[in-house]
Amino acid sequence: MDSSIESDLARLALQEEQLQFETFNADTAWQLGTLLKQAVEARGKAVAIDIQLFGQPLFFYAMPGTTPDNIDWIRRKRNVVQRFQRSSYAMRLELRKKQTTLTEQLGLPLRDYVVAGGGFPIRLRGSACIGAITISGVPMREDHGIIVEVLASWLNRPLSELALPPADDMDD
């Protein structure tokens, strides 16, 4: 088993444990969405951003340079977060570790589910996953990392303890 996958999975579990909210509402979503937009703009990149409590859209923004494909990727990543209550990137690495896919393991169609970085669970401390923060537009590990960076700042958690190291391969 690849030790970098194992260490990334441990870091992803820590992120999901530490980056939980005491409360979350439409104002929280608006502020986080705005911070995500600013973080991406500071990098000179473009993404689509979606924040939802499952079934209730709270924030959406498609930056100039994104396409309808980014919106579909968001939907598919969000479906993974909702079904598994984990980040879409954690699910990608879990399946890679097992050398399988969602289609092979559970029969889930690729048209509705994608295990790619950029979907992160909204979880109230001590509670279930209630929604997802999802972005699409940059490489998947970077999509995931931008969300973690903004959430760590918002929740006053040390990014140095939560950020993933740079990827070793071009796939992530």
Question: Where are the predicted features?
Answer:
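Juxtadomain coupling helices with adjacent low-complexity linkers
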Residues: 2-35, 39-41, 133-172
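Aromatic-enriched hydrophobic runs in primary sequence
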Residues: 11-16, 31, 59-61, 103, ...
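Short linear motifs at secondary-structure transitions and domain/linker junctions
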Residues: 22-28, 35, 94-99, 109-111
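General "foldedness" signal
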Residues: 50, 63-65, 71-74, 98, ...
